[in-house]
Amino acid sequence: MLKIGVIADDFTGATDIASFLVENGMPTVQINDVPTGTQPEGCDAVVISLKTRSCPAQEAIKQSLAALVWLKKQGCQQVYFKYCSTFDSTAEGNIGPVTDALMVALDTSFTVISPALPVNGRTVYQGYLFVMNHLLAESGMRHHPINPMTDSYLPRLMEAQAQGRCGVIPAQTLDEGVAATRAALSRLQQEGYRYAVLDALNERHLEIQGEVLRDAPLVTGGSGLAMGLARQWAKHGVSQARSAGYPLSGRAVVLSGSCSQMTNQQVAFYRQHAPTRDVDVARCLSSETREAYAEALAQWVLSQDSELAPMISATASTQALAAIQQQYGATEASHAVEALFSLLAARLAEGGITRFIVAGGETSGVVTQSLGITGFHIGPCISPGVPWVNALHAPVSLALKSGNFGDESFFIRAQREFQV
């Protein structure tokens, strides 16, 4: 029987939480889009990767409920709605509406909000969300192009988009332990609260959350809570849980589409050590020039024989990105570059590339779709929340990195620390 079923609102976020489950002893498979078949064998948890983070609430609800139907058919014991640790959802967002829809479908009147991921600098204190010691609304998320986060107080954010009152379980209560936390949650529920934001400043707080919530029908949050829950559910050692996703041997490539601050640092560092080509957006705009350009880039990648994998980068600084968007249009430029990566990934796979290291959520989704990958086994972590994975039905390994995850040397470590 499936122990945990995760409904994740974007691709790299799904891989992120899957890696935390594996690293805490739960063999895990990630499936892209709503599954149609039966549960893959040999796993205790399934993560369903949707593309609902930025879509209208009704569409997000529809897809999330479809995923829930499949999980119920597999006998899933606990449902986990996973969203970003920066709570990417304004009053017009869909975290609240999806949470409410799942609560109705699971016949539960109370759930938790736990976006914290302390290992990556996302903490919650007194209900306020912090990113690297800055309040959410004072971090780079205040400039997010789709979901600008201008408030840091999670209960207020939740109440603006959901159907009930939201309370807080403060860090002091978590410090008192499991019994105190369980009692505080019970009090909020009795007082008519529908949601409870859980503070978390450290790993111990997440462990307490996991113990308290082991039998909850529905939890919501980022990846941190998954660590606490997995430690309650796990029956396997970490090495056994990782084994199915250990990277294959073969040639590798780095494809970078994210323009986040960390990815800019990673690309700048990596280009000092490996052959690199930057994407020319002008050559991506029409289908005719794009196809020829993708072929030229593929031939260049396949001709390299360096120790470290060649890199194709569309990563740009904030100023350079603004100039590109002004010249070509933000949507047009983004779609053109992703279309290039789609063509390029398919051509590289045909040419014998078996390991793809990809930066950026949208780019990761495009690459896996282009390669026809519908799901994969989760392997060992390169950085917190970024594992190697192996495709379920193809000889392909991928490292799929959300924009701001990983350290400066991520692209190098992904290769040198996992040599076959």
Curated annotation (Swiss-Prot):
* Reaction catalysis annotation: 3-dehydro-L-erythronate + ATP = 3-dehydro-4-O-phospho-L-erythronate + ADP + H(+); 3-dehydro-D-erythronate + ATP = 3-dehydro-4-O-phospho-D-erythronate + ADP + H(+)
Q: Name the enzyme group at the top EC level.
A: transferase
The molecular function terms in GO held by this entry are:
ATP binding; kinase activity
Segments crossing the lipid bilayer = none
Q: What name does this protein carry?
A: 3-oxo-tetronate kinase
Describe the outcome of a gene knockout. Deletion mutant is unable to use L-threonate or D-erythronate as a carbon source.
Q: Which SUPFAM superfamilies match?
A: YgbK-like (SSF142764)
Q: Which UniProt keywords apply?
A: ATP-binding, Carbohydrate metabolism, Kinase, Nucleotide-binding, Transferase
Q: Which family does it belong to?
A: Belongs to the four-carbon acid sugar kinase family.
Q: Which gene encodes it?
A: otnK
| Taxonomic superkingdom | Bacteria
General function of this protein: Catalyzes the ATP-dependent phosphorylation of 3-oxo-tetronate to 3-oxo-tetronate 4-phosphate.
Which residues are ATP-binding?
S258, G360, G361, E362, T363, G403
So which residues are the signal peptide here? none
Q: What Pfam families does the annotation carry?
A: NBD_C, SBD_N
Q: Is the ATP-binding keyword given for this protein?
A: yes
User: What EC number(s) does its UniProt record assign?
Assistant: 2.7.1.217
Q: InterPro entries, from UniProt?
A: 4-carb_acid_sugar_kinase_N, 4-carb_acid_sugar_kinase_N_sf, NBD_C, NBD_C_sf, OtnK
